[in-house]
């Protein structure tokens, strides 16, 4: 298996002429990592004051994650249930930023996206802990947010750290796994969209990045 940082470094000085960069420091995938989340955060330089963001279902799925955060002063923002991320959710997360050094978002897209945009707007370190393989955007630089009854995709930030506990991911409901499969299949359409945009608007295009996506 190719080391993540080796893979990123191999895209330096690309023939397409674009600078390919990735702000992710660490990706940890393995069984039982829910009990190691705190140590992973410390290893990657997260400060002692932490916001834990989740909803009741995702926090239950990640049972044991709070116990792993020994040594952190933890504030909690727990939605009863969050299906669609709104700008109000972004602003709720931002309301903690005078009291925390980083954010641990536990869940998938609807939990991650408001944290992703809030952290981007305030340059706050972010760790995403995945509780289901329901989408393919864990490393995304954008966040779809409902604002004024319109869903808008905002430029955001990728997380500094991504953690996936394979036991938790395997135990996710079948419909969430199916949603993730659908997201992966849609990448083929997205690559065609990218080529069309390159032809019609001159958007930059890199065949090496496209090929990496196809292989994934």
What residues fall within each predicted segment?
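ATP/NTP phosphate-donor binding region
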Residues: 1-102, 160, 172, 178-182, ...
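A glycine/threonine-rich phosphate-anchoring loop and its flanking beta-alpha core
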Residues: 122-215
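Short, electropositive, low-hydrophobicity segments enriched in small/polar residues
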Residues: 34, 111-113, 134, 141
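Short beta-strand/turn micro-motifs composed of small residues
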Residues: 53-54, 107, 164
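Short glycine-/acidic-enriched loop or helix-start segments at secondary-structure transitions
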Residues: 62-64, 114-116, 138-139, 173-174
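Short, charged low-complexity intrinsically disordered segments located at boundaries
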Residues: 67-72, 210-216
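A short, small-residue-rich loop immediately preceding and capping a beta-strand
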Residues: 97-132
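Generic recognition of cysteine residues
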Residues: 14-16, 22, 115, 119, ...
């Amino acid at each position: 298996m190719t080391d993540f940082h080796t893979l990123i470094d191999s895209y330096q000085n690309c023939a397409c002429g674009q600078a390919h960069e990735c702000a992710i420091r660490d990706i940890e995938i393995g069984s039982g990592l829910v009990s190691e989340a705190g140590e992973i955060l410390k290893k990657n330089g997260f400060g002692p004051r932490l916001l834990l963001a989740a909803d009741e279902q995702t926090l239950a799925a990640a049972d044991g994650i709070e116990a792993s955060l020994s040594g952190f002063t933890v504030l909690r923002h727990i939605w009863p249930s969050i299906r669609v991320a709104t700008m109000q959710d972004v602003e709720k997360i931002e309301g903690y930023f005078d009291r925390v050094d980083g954010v641990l978002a536990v869940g998938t897209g609807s939990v991650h996206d408001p944290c992703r945009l809030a952290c981007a707007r305030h340059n706050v370190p972010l760790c995403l802990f995945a509780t289901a393989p329901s989408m393919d955007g864990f490393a995304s630089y954008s966040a779809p947010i409902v604002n004024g009854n319109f869903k808008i995709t905002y430029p955001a930030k990728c997380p500094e750290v991504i953690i996936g506990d394979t036991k938790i991911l395997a135990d996710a409901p079948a419909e969430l796994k199916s949603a993730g499969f659908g997201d992966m299949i849609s990448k083929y359409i997205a690559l065609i969209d990218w080529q069309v945009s390159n032809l019609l608007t001159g958007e930059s295009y890199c065949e090496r990045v496209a090929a990496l996506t196809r292989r994934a």
